[in-house]
Amino acid sequence: MIRFTTAGESHGEGLFVIIEGIPAGLTINSEDIDLELARRQKGYGRGQRMCIETDTVKVFSGMRHTVSLGSPIAMYIANKDFKNWTKIMSPTSVDSEVTPLLRPRPGHADLPGFMKYGVNDFRDILERASARETAARVAAGAVCKALLKEFEISIVSYTSQIGDVTADISSVEECKIWHDAEISCVRCPDAKASEKMIQLIKKAGEKGDTLGGKVVVVTKNVPAGLGSHTQWDLKLDGRLAQSLISIQAVKAVEFGAGTKLASLLGALSHDEIFYDVTRGFYRDTNRAGGIEGGMSNGEPIVVTCTMKAIPSLANPLHSVNLATKETAEAEAIRSDVCAVPAVGIVAEAAIAVELAKALKEKFGGDSLKDMKKNVNIYKERIKAL
């Protein structure tokens, strides 16, 4: 089974991730992981910290000469900003007192964590709750992307909305969508919408405010049959949704036509089935988003994630001082104005991990060679139907 765990605080010395279950024999280049980390850091509206950090990964175990061994892969990403936080974030005792944070931000983990863990300073909560943790997830996702690539499965994403500005890609060729998204500073393939998004982010920043939005993630060439209908926790869409909704500030996840299906009749809600000797079973529409009955159906898996506006505002909201219980402004903590473009990259990583996990559960194999053999046998059986 493929699984990963992360450790590290936002302003601590660094982030750690250990991923288990990757089959032996997979080539993983650290440069490819660094590329994914760099994609996560880009985007108009990111905060000053992105000028400090240049994330790169260091692999400590589980690989030899760029090839996986089948044992746990341990990776480390240094926080270059730690030099400015050594006293505040020291894991050992310090000589002088550190001023506690006591004015929780609405929408963040500050107050719930303060109550749950009984701390005296909610920095103990926010440091781990921070979206900085997603850098470790992106590293794990990059490893899983390398595995999926061996089976010609690819994951791409774009920004479809920021604030009240929505992209129109109805007239854009599919291959151009992904190209234009990568060269846009907000990862939006609609040039006109992209410029409006930039202006909107600029205005929000000037007001000390933040913005949310939506990203669309598409996974191509997923074989039919990943996931299962047999138990609630084996359903592929359920597993993907849990992974995606766990991303900081993501508040909704939709598959295919998503919430639009609420207003459609059944005849317009589902994807009719066709058959061709060359293509096999196929659909002319993809309202299901590539998953039916908790299983992949062979069509592209299409997911939309909605991200709320970041709760760290330069112009803080109303709050309460936890020590005095008096009215106060929430803590003003350095943050992004808009991180929607980055969420697309984190969502790609989350999906990569879950699909790699489902792929290995379906086809097994301690080595990549065995896994490929099993996949080929399965594809031949499907082709013969």
UniProtKB/Swiss-Prot annotation:
User: Its Gene Ontology molecular function terms?
Assistant: chorismate synthase activity; FMN binding
Matching InterPro entries, A to Z?
A: Chorismate_synth, Chorismate_synth_AroC_sf, Chorismate_synthase_CS
Q: Which cofactor does it need?
A: FMNH2
Where does the secretion signal sit in this chain?
none
Q: Where does FMN bind?
A: R128, A129, S130, Q248, A249, G293, K308, A309, I310, P311, S312, R334
- Chain positions recorded as NADP(+) binding sites: R40, R46
| SUPFAM superfamilies, per database record | Chorismate synthase, AroC
Q: Does the keyword Hydrolase apply?
A: no
Q: Which GO terms describe its biological process?
A: amino acid biosynthetic process; aromatic amino acid family biosynthetic process; chorismate biosynthetic process
Give the pathway listed in the UniProt entry for this protein: Metabolic intermediate biosynthesis; chorismate biosynthesis; chorismate from D-erythrose 4-phosphate and phosphoenolpyruvate: step 7/7
Q: Give the matching Gene3D superfamilies.
A: Chorismate synthase AroC
Q: What is its EC number?
A: 4.2.3.5
Known catalytic reactions: 5-O-(1-carboxyvinyl)-3-phosphoshikimate = chorismate + phosphate
- What does the note accompanying the cofactor annotation read? Reduced FMN (FMNH(2)).
Keyword Amino-acid biosynthesis on entry: yes
| Quaternary structure note | Homotetramer.
Query: Can you tell me which family this protein belongs to?
Result: Belongs to the chorismate synthase family.
The protein's role, per its UniProt record: This reaction introduces a second double bond into the aromatic ring system.
For this entry, the protein name equals: Chorismate synthase
Q: Give the source lineage, highest ranks first.
A: Bacteria, Pseudomonadati, Elusimicrobiota, Endomicrobiia, Endomicrobiales
